[in-house]
Structures are given as structure tokens and as C-alpha cells.
Amino acid sequence: MAEPDNFDTRDRQHIPIDVFRETAAYTFPSRNQERKPLRGDYAAHAAHLLDQLAVALGDVPLPADDPRLAVQGLKSGTIVEITTLPPAEDSRTKAVKVPTALEFPTQDVVVLRSERNDDRTESALLFVPDDARAFLQGRISEYGRDPGNQRRPDVERFEVVEEVRAIDTGSLFTGAVDLTAPDIVWWELWVRQPVALADRLVNAARSANIDVHDDRLIFPDTTVLFLHGAAATVALFATRVPGAITEIRRATGTIEPFLDRGETGRGQHDWVAELSQRVSAPAQDSPVVCTLDTGVAAAHPLIAPGLRGAWAYDAAWGSDDHQPNGGHGTPLAGLVLYGDLEPLMNDARPVTLTHGAESMKLLPPHGFPPTKPPSYGVVTQGAVSAVEIERPGALRSFCIATSATDFPPSRPSTWSGALDQIIAGAMPGEVDDKVAAAERPKRLMVVATGNVSGGMAVDVLPSQPLEDPSQSWNALTIGGFTRKEQPPAPPPVLQAAVPANHRSPFSRGSQSLPDDLTPIKPEVLFEAGNMMSDATGFCGWDPSVSLLSAGSDVTGEPLIPFWATSAAVGMAGNFVGRLQAARPDIWPETHRALIVDSARWPEPIRKKFIGTGAHWKTGKAATKAKKQAMLREFGYGVPDIDRAILSARNDATLVAQAEIQPFAIGADGRTGVFNEMHFYDLPWPKTALEQLENEIITMKVTLSYFIEPNLTGKAATRPDTYRSFGLRFDMKKRTETSARFRSRISASQAKDGTEADGETSCWLLGPKAIQAGSLHCDLWRGRAIDLAGHDAIAVYPVGGWWKSHVGQKRVADKARYALVISISAPGQKVDLYSEITTLVDAKEIEVLLG
């Protein structure tokens, strides 16, 4: 019997395509090595560098006058700062990078830290041991000599170096520091590995009467110690152990959830009583969403049915919600369980909770001292471990709605790095040489971008930079949009700060961050409420354009307004819980990919990307850079729970989950090399696409995996030193043969002598636009008949510290990823789904029969 014309109805499971995966050897394709010389006179440049180096290094102090401490395993040496030359004014180069090859590891000449400058140069702190001075000077001298017909030695090391200079006492500090300030505060000291060096520095610091906390964070290349003292004291200690410390940061201490309240909220007891009678508790084995916040009012009639546990990082704090004016953890948990309560209050239907909530108090109540050290990386890892000990085995995700304002998001922090470890299953004690990374449990975590407070519209409405730790690569970062614009009645002299279906004025983004060094954040948007603006242009929160949730004052004010990205994270937690309840069988990486795949831009935002006809907007207002910037403000849109869970006949989603070994030990037994890639000859609905001919169709590809972070001073300018491994995807071109596609991706694949015709790219970003992050998403928009030829995709590795840091013995480790591909023809009476599943069934039979 023929199916009814319900082409848009979502009633079909997503389509697994793992049976189409083929593993192949991967070799990085060779590139044209021809390059233009950057120096007109190399001898003069070498002489210039030698002169500057001599001044920067100074004389080696006599033993009797040497202030440096003798630390076992640490060579005595000096730190100098090098800066690259700027690119040409007309160059499209993002920056002239500090060369990776600048280091001589066998001599312990190493880059401690690097950073991007506003003039598109980069600077680095270079440690030069005393016994390596002559070696380094000799290499620079050789670089300056005429090589004759040979290649100039070390040109890749020294050619771009413009300046070498001595450092000052504050050079190791990240950000501005007042060395005269008497305040005794906590500092992060980033210490080079091995861990034994950090242990020796602890002893040295304590011998100098500096307070060092026992807690620490451990990353592959760095151990983070926490010292308590004045800036000058810490700086003096650092100058006495040059080469041991890569950088010094003020320990995170300003956690600022959006907690302002204002006028009394509008909760009423009869509303709560009526709704609570309609609520059915979730099953005991249902997924849970754990909020890491200010605690929870466990007795609240709307919280109690779904609450599966409430604890505190420090038991002395108690698990109740200590935040005044209605709490913060309680309304967050309310949104996690129910979403916005306003539509439920205006309804009469039963409410069945699909998932539970847990609360772990992460922040100390008023009157309690701050945690020591004030490192929310340490605290968050401890909190997550405690929850999992209390209720082991639960399918669980985590929500963080708090942020810190005192650290720039352009580089990883100890908090964002700690989140990346949590999510990847790589906290201290979790990494086991006998267990592949792919087999360790992973965690899904949603994190707020941080908030923009009220103020004048001219200051509030332009998107502001992210707050720490939302730059985390592995976390799903949540921004805000709003559908709320109704002013309070009777009409005052107020109007909504932004129209409905725009980015919420509370939300932050990453468009001001370097797109070659940082991930696209936020990835998605959820309802965050709006601001109201008065006649002077002043914007601020208002209950009429906020969400409604449970309040911590159960007897006095059980319902309160809740807003900003804290509310958006609560809504995201609700979405995650519902998705995990519907699909408990898939990985956290896959849940994250499906959330992003399901997202669509509201119409006013969509018009910023899409022009008339088949293509994306073009022109000066829609360059690749402008599109990247818009993504960094709006993400990939607002997720749709039905789309995330189910496909339709004209909107099919294909899903793959796979393990991959990105690297292996090379033939020399000493270096890491690329190992394997995956090809998918996709079950492509060519017949249906060709029948649609020139109709507009959209394809979305999302690749999701979790990296293990390596927090080093170089991570800010070298994404490949921060990630353990990286993956990318590329799709077969419309006119490309399968053999040509394979050889284009990997040098190890045989070439067929053909070239793809020049074709207009229909991708929003294109395969070369992604440099950082662990979730990569791109959209293809064009004619259906053109999409018919894009019937294969490759997933291949890019570098990471597993490959470059052979001494860590992780080269041959296995990773895993989720790949989601959706093809959407909304409004079209076309059955993409059935054609795809027919091909999948045929392939499965073929494999079964051998």
C-alpha cells in the first residue's frame, strides 16, 4: 500500500551507515615546497640576530653571583623573547607564525610560550641553556653563510625571526600584572614536564617560604601548581628557575553567574500545586543531567519528582541553594527538568519527565572561604568524580552556567582544559596504558558563553567575547537567542532590546577571536530571554521577557523569572536529557553532533547567510571571513528536538560511529606518522535528487570527537600542540571520480590520472576553513542535481601531540568519532529516506553474504 503524503513527518529512525566504512592507509598529500626568500641579505640578517641574541642573553653569571637555583633535572639558562616579522600589507596571511622548528629539543632550546600580536606577528619566549649558547650561535652563523647550490640550512627556523630581546620580570605573566601590588593572592605556575620537576619546584618554593597548595592539574606537557603570594614574590621565584615555568596566571577566582534579581518574581503557590499534580516522575534508570552550580531546593514540589541526588563539593556547604533572591541552581534545575514553565502553566495536559536532575554545589555559600586553590579546574574535576562515586553507572550529562571574567578566551585556561579532560575521560587517574582512549567513558557537558550585563544599547547589543571556560574545545557551548518581545502591560516607555528570533542581548560569541586558533563558539543557541530598553537607550533584564522557573524560596516565592545564558544552559540541559532518553544507545560525541545537526537559524538570522536562489550570500558583506564571524556570533542555530531524534522522508539523517587510529610509529621506530583514514561510499539517493533537478536542497555534515588537551604555553598559537589528535572531513566533488577523490585526500592512494572539473563551491565555509576545535560542521546549499555527485566522504587525521610527543607513548592510541550527514528538502514531495535505506539494506546483505 502506498504511503500517504506525509513527507515532512518525523517518524523514522536515523540511518546508520557504518557498513559503508572502508579503512585505508593515510599519508599527508605533498605540497609545493617552492617558496620566495623573505630576506634580501641573509648574512646581514644572521649578523643582526647574533648581535641581538648576545645582548638578550648577557653574560653567564659567575657561580658566586648566580641567583638561579640549582634544581635537579633543570639546566641553568636564560629566557629570551623572539618576535616574527609582520606579513606584507596586502597578504591574506593570518599571521607570520613562530616556527615549530625553532626548537632544538636535544639541546633543551625550547619555546616556553607563544602568542599572537595585533600586528599579525607572533612572539615567543625561548629558553636557551648556558651550555647551548655556542650551539645556537653556530646554527645562526651557518644560516647566514652562502650555501652555494645547496639549500640554506635552518632557513625554516630563523628566516622569519625579526627581533630577539631580553625579557623583563613580568614577561612570564599572562596579562597585565602590577608587581608592586602587596595583595597576597593565588597564582597558577605552569611547569614543564616531567612531573618530578614540579615536585622539586614545590620544595624550592616552600624553602623560600612561599605557600604552595597540594592540589595540582596535570596535562601531558604541563603540571599546574598553585602558589599563594604577592606578585613580586612569585615573579622573583620564577626568575630564579628560568626554563622551568612556561607562564604564570592569576588563579581563576571571579565566578560570576548572572544572579541579579530586582523586583519580586511572579510565582504563585496555586500554579505550582496545579502543575505538580500533572507531573509524572522519570523512570529510575532514566538519564540524568547534573548541574554544577549553587545547590538546589530539593523540597520544591516541581524539583522533587525529578531530583536524583544533591551534594556539595565540600560537605560543610550543604546541598541547598544558597544564592539569595530565588537561587540560581534551583531555577537552573527547573529548566533542566521542564524547560520554560510558562507554556506548561498555560496548559492542562499531563507532564511526563523523560530524565532526572542531579545537583552538585560547585560554589561556596556566603560566609565560607573560597576554595583553595581558587582553581575551578580542580574543583570541577573533583565535583564530577564525586557525583560519579555517589551514583555510578548512570547515563549522565553535565551543565555549567557559571563563568569567569578574569581570563581571555583566546587561549585555553586551566578551567577550560580541565573540562576538556573531563569530557574526554582523561582526568588524572582515568588514563590507563592498557585501555585505548576510544574505550574510556566520555561525558557530554554544556557550558554557557557567559553574559553581557545591562547598559546602554550601543554597548550591549554588539556581541562581546566569550567568558572562561566556554572556549573549551570539547564542551558544547551554549549561546542565547530569544522569541520574547512582549513588553509589560500597561505599555510603559519600554521596548524589547532586540526583535523576536534574534540573538539574545545577553549572549556572547567568539567573532573577535582568531579563527585559525580558536573553535567556533557558541555552537548552538537556546532561549535566554530579552532585555527591555528605555527612552534613553538603557537596556536591562525584565521579568516580562524572561523565562519562568522554580525558585529556591519554596514557601515565599516558588516561581521566579530566570534569564540570560544561565537560562539558555538550562534549556540546553533539558534538550540533552530528552535526547539521551530517546537515544541512550549512542555516544556522547554523537549526541553532540545530533544537537548541532538539528539546529536551524531563525528566519531573521537565516537571511544574513542565504541570498536569492540556490547560493549563500556573496559580496563584501558575505565573504568567507564574514560568514565565519557570523557563525561565531549565532552558531549553527537553534536545535530542534524532533529533528535530533528522528528523520522524515524528505529530510534524512545518516549517522556513523567509528574508532580510528590516527597515527603510528614510523619505519625509523622513533617518529610518529599518519596511519589511517576512513572512506564512506555513501548510500546516496541519486534518483530522487536527479528527479528534483534544480530544486534547492541543503546538506549538513557534522564531525564530532573529543580531544585530550595538552595545556602548554604554546597552545595559544599552535592548535596541534593542544589537541591529542585532530580529524577533518572532505567530500567527493561533483565531477570527481572515486579514485581521484581518494588520491586527492591521501598520497598513499593510487591516482587515476584525471582531474575534477572546476566547479563552484556550494559550501558555507569549505574544507580549509577549520583549524581548531573538536566539532566541525559545514553546510552545502545548491541544486539537487548537483548534490547527486557528492556521494562519498572521507574522514582523515591531522596532527596532534599523540603524534609529535612520542615520549608520551600514545602514538598508536585509538580515538573515536561520530559523523552525521543530513539531507534536507523541506516542503518537497520526495522520498530521500526510502532510497537510502534500500541501499543500506542491500549493502548489509552483501556484507552478510561475504
Regions from the language model: what does each represent?
Residues G58-S91, T174-Q193:
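Short glycine-/aliphatic-rich beta-strand segments at the starts of folded cytosolic domains
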Residues I696-G850:
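Long mid-to-C-terminal assembly/interaction modules of large eukaryotic proteins
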